[in-house]
Structures are given as C-alpha cells and as structure tokens.
Amino acid sequence: MTKERLLAALDKPRTTRGLLTVVNPGGSEDQVQTMLMQMREEGLVKFDINKGLWSRA
C-alpha cells in the first residue's frame, strides 16, 4: 500500500474502512489509519470529524 494508492482511492470522501476495502482488502485497518495520519500531517488529506470521512486536502 502506498500514498499514491490511498490518494487515488480518495476520488470521493471515504471512511477508513472504505479505504481499506478499496486499497487493500484483507489488510490491516491500523496500517491504513497510520498512513492517513502521516499524510494528514503532510497536508495531503483531511478528516471531517463530524462525518468520519477522509478526503483529499
């Protein structure tokens, strides 16, 4: 799983679980969450706390 694949999967806002099923079915949700947090710190993605959705920044 790469940052590029995660960004490509964010063609629309998705939940962490939704991203996992698109990018790496059967993978670790913790791994996706960790990568998303790193990408958020870099300003690549944002999280809507009210809706629970990740999207491109």
Q: Predicted regions span which residues?
A:
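Short capping segments at the starts of secondary-structure elements
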Residues: 9-18, 27
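Short amphipathic alpha-helical interaction segments
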Residues: 26-38
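Short, cationic-aromatic polyanion-contact patches
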Residues: 47-57
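Glycine-centered, phosphate/nucleic-acid-interacting loop/turn motifs that mediate DNA/RNA or nucleotide
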Residues: 43
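Short, leucine-enriched amphipathic alpha-helices that occur as contiguous helical runs
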Residues: 2-7, 29
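Residues within the alpha-helical elements of helix-turn-helix
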Residues: 22-24
